[in-house]
Amino acid sequence: MNILFILKQFPRYGGVEKMTITLSNSLVKIGYNVCILSLFKGNKCEYMSRLDSKVVCLNMPNEKLFSRENRRHFLLVLQENEIDVIINQNMDYEVNKLMLKLKGNVQGNGKYFPAFITVVHNDPFVDFKCLDTMIKGRGVKNVLKRMLKPIYQVYIHNVVRRSYIMASLVSDKMVVLSKSYVSSCAELSRCEYEKIIAIPNGFNVDDKVDGLFLNRKKLLYVGRLVETQKKISELINIWKYLCEEFLDWDLLIVGDGPDVGIYKSLVKSENIKNVYFEGSTNSPEYYFNQSTVVCLTSESEGFPMVLIEGMKYGCIPICYDSFSAVDDIIDDGVNGYVIPFNKQNEYICKLRYLMSLDDTSLCYMRNNAIKKSELYDMNKVVFEWEKLFNELI
């Protein structure tokens, strides 16, 4: 069977791109032919070193998405590679509008168009949950958005709904990352529940896990350094209340992004001890192997693989209940901790408790975390994708 992934830009750093590589490699491993089509020119990215050499990477020839050259090229890609299934990895309205037009033209001429799957990689309501953070700042646009917030909320709702409806129109199936997202996806896209299926992200189990029982007194954040949605300043402020009490512990912040300067300034101005900015990395497992706790303070997430990858290495996850899929990942008090959203004091208290546990108790939770992560072994996840392919073909 021949599979085509569509991404807006590939390669580039990001969770969607990383998961595309992981799934592509797993499909190739079990005999599928895989192509990845980038609609716009990508950037150099270390992730590419992990992509199986059998995966064919393609690009649209023209930067103008709707150009005749691009339309012809896309249909040629389908024909030459005998594509059976398209996996669309974005919710962009214009992209899906183009796909719907091409699908209509092909089917209108009595020809076969591949099965079309769109993957929703976030909480469908993320734009509403993060609205207040999105309109913070001193810029004129943000000031106007705050002044006209009720109107802006309606505008955002209409933009998001329009994108979901367009995705639903072009898709034979829509994939969300958790069963808890099915109803919200159906509400926004106005489609039947039967059209939506939940398949989680997965990870490869090939890497060796070392040092489970070592004394690893480190808290870890891995991800984009951007305040909108991620709210890393919240984690830094939480650490501010603990760093003097736990001088033998460190907070490692791994990643890069537009707000890294803000976070470094916050650490410096507040004189917060033992915070280390490690920059971006293509080997987060190095940091997982060093750490005891993996932290998130996001105001919304989709299905954060950073928690599951950390659990694989024996890191105990702690995060806010700001996304419904958290219950798929963490069993509170068993293999990690889930804190009510925006309850910073509870987050601080739970971290203090966790950092004070004896080695036996820590190892018990770490082992539980490892066992839970095994549910998301890519070998199990790819089986769910195979079932979906067979249903559509």
Task: List the predicted regions and their residue ranges.
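N-terminal strand-loop element at the rim of the active site
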Residues: 6-13, 19-20, 26-66, 181, ...
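A conserved mid-protein helix/loop that constitutes part of the nucleotide-sugar donor-binding site
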Residues: 17-22, 217, 226-241, 258-264
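Short His-centered aromatic/hydrophobic patch
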Residues: 88-95, 120-123
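Membrane-proximal helix-turn-helix segments that form the acceptor-binding/catalytic region
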Residues: 140-174
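Aromatic "clamp/platform" in nucleotide-sugar-dependent glycosyltransferases that forms part
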Residues: 280, 299
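Short hydrophobic beta-strand element within catalytic cores of glycosyltransferases
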Residues: 316-320
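Conserved acidic donor-binding segment of nucleotide-sugar-dependent glycosyltransferases
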Residues: 321, 331-333, 337-345, 353-359
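A short, well-ordered alpha-helix in the C-terminal region of glycosyltransferases
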Residues: 360-375, 384-387
